[in-house]
UniProtKB/Swiss-Prot annotation:
This is Phenylalanine ammonia-lyase 2. GO terms for cellular component: cytoplasm; protein-containing complex. The keyword Cytoplasm applies. It catalyses: L-phenylalanine = (E)-cinnamate + NH4(+). Its EC number is 4.3.1.24.
Length: 716
């Protein structure tokens, strides 16, 4: 039978209409959890992005996503608003009314008539005063001067959204009007100031959440930040938000409902995971670009290899890389190179390239699993006691224990550190001319390598980033301390772990930024390499034809057969090993060209005795003409490329990875770095990092994969 508050009084349905007596085929929710993991990770990321960009977040208690939390936290109230489900009002009111009725009947209930935690043996009939004291003693945070000890406003906004969502489910005993007030604060971009530290996320995030309650109740020590960054008093905050009726006098249980939840930890975890999912996909695509510029062998993505390993994250990572590399102009060129000279490089690529799917796959699985765990948490009812109107009772439990947050954040941080470790290994190969298959040391792009040290500083910075990231990978959750007179003797440290994971994400963005700019530099160096090699070949061929074809009397000369071997050497020699001074006798070009001519002369037999048929006699003339012509031709080719008129276009434009290159070079205007320019690497890295932090990299990243059908290429 339904009472006037919309609650079933003789069944097991609360005011929100949830019937827990109904039989279900999945009573333990393992099926729901498994179903949430179906489909590809990339499709899930695309869905996240689409949801992130919606202008309205509609809260009903059970459908909140990490994308919506990230949107509210990042967009500061501009372009996105929160709406509360009117259907939830009855359930919220029913639980609030139940608490008041219970209090009036003299029913003993934790946090309503009792003290808190280890001192819950104390009793009082002053329910409102008890809630007021709860907020007072929990306001134990330290802010100091400045904002160093204040929780970032984005994380506070996330916490506010998550807490509203929890309380909307009607099990907490709080008035709907309080939830509407918090919503107005969000929509008007008025953010309470919460302490950065001071919570162990069990019983919930008591200390930081008490400052939201402090603002709602008008505590004089409460502060908020307005839309323009101005510090507001509670009175100013209420006025600006349009909250009418003055400060709230908390009714029994309402203070506890506001503070006894995991919203701060899970809110920040949601923000972190939104970015972690994007960065995981970026790592997959950048690994494929790394294979392109390193002239890697694409067979490392072959589906059979990964099918036999069985791990879905690995299979998807390999399929994504395979898609990027399929038809790549770099892969085609590399295949020709390997066929021409199979001994020029090792039979197998190094682990950072060849095992990148095996390395990234488990990290993606961990991040995806953590995402689902946090998504369940932000839709959970996590305070205590829970008000079960249907059974006319308050249930004392421990849903405030934020273990899912602490564990998922520890695991996510470990995955982020592993992604960073791979990125560092790849970057280290990229800048090292002993490993990078012909690219210049440090990716130096200028004419004079003695005055151009390219990405050397960036490599040092990457080592620093990676070291700090590996340190952060250490778990937080094994540092639990017994708290609150040994009542809270195990606790989750959820927010601490979320904060450390947020730091890890920032560092991974620094590494991703540096690596992406390095990859773009390598792409342009391959373009330069191709143009310069073509110029050298054409010049050597031209001089060979002019000098080596004919004898002094116009007859065909034996040296005419040298040209093919001369050009074969030019093909095989790394261009950046000599191009800064191509005709230097100490560099390999002139040495190998002379060696080739000498070898032909030694095979020329008795012809060498005749001045008219001697190949030895041609060497000096050949070298002199080459010295006169080649430096000019090389400089001309460089100048043409720098002016945007290269003889050979950039292969990247034919590749699926082009959108990321285009984003860096054209949309952000990041320069090709050389020692000849004034611009430092850090100035350019900053632009990419800022854009990445704003989410501007998402569209070009997804554009690289827009034609992927979600499956690996068939095994033929």
């Amino acid at each position: 039978m339904e009472n006037g508050n919309g609650a079933i009084t003789n069944g097991h349905v609360n005011g929100n209409g949830m019937d827990f007596c109904m039989k279900t085929e999945d009573p333990l929710y393992w099926g729901i959890a498994a179903e949430a993991m179906t489909g590809s990770h990339l499709d899930e990321v695309k869905k996240m992005v689409a949801e992130y960009r919606k202008p309205v977040v509609k809260l009903g208690g059970e459908t909140l996503t990490i994308s919506q939390v990230a949107a509210i936290s990042a967009r500061d109230g501009s372009g996105v608003t929160v709406e509360l489900s009117e259907a939830a009002r009855a359930g919220v009111k029913a639980s609030s009314d139940w608490v008041m009725d219970s209090m009036n009947k003299g029913t003993d209930s934790y946090g309503v008539t009792t003290g808190f935690g280890a001192t819950s043996h104390r009793r009082t009939k002053q329910g409102g005063a008890l809630q007021k004291e709860l907020i007072r003693f929990l306001n134990a945070g330290i802010f100091g001067n400045g904002s160093d000890n204040t929780l970032p406003h984005s994380a506070t906004r996330a916490a506010m959204l998550v807490r509203i969502n929890t309380l909307l489910q009607g099990y907490s005993g709080i008035r709907f009007e309080i939830l509407e007030a918090i919503t107005k604060f969000l929509n008007q971009n008025i953010t309470p100031c919460l302490p950065l530290r001071g919570t162990i996320t069990a019983s919930g995030d008591l200390v930081p959440l008490s400052y939201i309650a402090g603002l709602l109740t008008g505590r004089p020590n409460s502060k908020a930040v307005g839309p323009t960054g101005v510090i507001l008093s509670p009175e100013e905050a209420f006025k600006l938000a349009g909250v009418e009726g003055g400060f709230f006098e908390l009714q029994p249980k309402e203070g506890l409902a506001l503070v006894n939840g995991t919203a701060v930890g899970s809110g920040m975890a949601s923000m972190v995971l939104f970015e972690a999912n994007i960065l995981a996909v970026l790592a997959e695509v950048m690994s494929a670009i790394f294979a392109e510029v390193m002239q890697g062998k694409p067979e490392f993505t072959d589906h059979l290899t990964h099918k036999l390993k069985h791990h879905p994250g690995q299979i998807e990572a390999a399929a994504i890389m395979e898609h990027i590399l399929d038809g790549s102009a770099y892969v085609k060129a590399a295949q020709k190179l390997h066929e021409m000279d199979p001994l020029q490089k090792p039979k197998q690529d190094r682990y950072a390239l060849r095992t990148s799917p095996q390395w990234l796959g488990p990290q993606i699985e961990v991040i995806r699993s953590s995402t689902k765990m946090i998504e369940r948490e932000i839709n959970s009812v996590n305070d205590n006691p829970l008000i079960d109107v249907s059974r006319n009772k308050a249930i004392h439990g421990g849903n405030f224990q934020g273990t899912p947050i602490g564990m998922s954040m520890d695991n996510t941080r470990l995955a982020i550190a592993a992604i960073g470790k791979l990125m560092f290994a790849q970057f280290s190969e990229l800048v090292n001319d002993f490993y990078n298959n012909g690219l210049p040391s440090n990716l130096s792009g200028g004419r004079n390598p003695s005055l151009d040290y390219g990405f050397k500083g960036a490599e040092i910075a990457m080592a620093s980033y990676c070291s700090e990231l590996q340190f952060l990978a250490n778990p937080v959750t094994n540092h639990v301390q017994s708290a609150e007179q040994h009542n809270q003797d195990v606790n989750s440290l959820g927010l601490i772990s979320s904060r450390k994971t947020s730091e890890a994400v920032e560092i991974l963005k620094l590494m991703s930024t540096t690596f992406l700019v390095g990859l773009c530099q390598a792409i342009d160096l391959r373009h330069l390499e191709e143009n310069l090699k073509s110029t050298v070949k054409n010049t050597v061929s031209s001089v060979a034809k002019r000098v080596l074809t004919m004898g002094v009397n116009g007859e065909l000369h034996p040296s005419r057969f040298c040209e093919k071997d001369l050009l074969r050497f030019v093909d095989r020699e790394y261009i950046f090993a000599y191009i800064d001074d191509p005709c230097s006798a100490t560099y390999p070009l002139m040495q190998k060209l002379r060696q080739t001519l000498v070898e032909h002369a030694l095979k020329n037999g008795d012809n060498e005795r005749n001045m008219n048929t001697s190949i030895f006699q041609k060497i000096a003339t050949f070298e002199d003409e080459l010295k006169a012509l080649l430096p000019k031709e090389v400089e001309s080719a460089r100048a043409a490329l720098e002016s945007g008129n290269p003889a050979i276009p950039n292969r990247i434009e034919e590749c699926r990875s082009y959108p990321l290159y285009k984003f860096v070079r054209k949309e952000l205007g990041i320069e090709y770095l050389t020692g000849e320019k004034v611009t430092s690497p850090g100035e350019e890295f900053d632009k990419v990092f800022i854009a990445m932090s704003k989410g501007e990299i998402i569209d070009p990243l997804l554009e690289c994969l827009e034609s992927w059908n979600g499956a690996p290429l068939p095994i033929c």
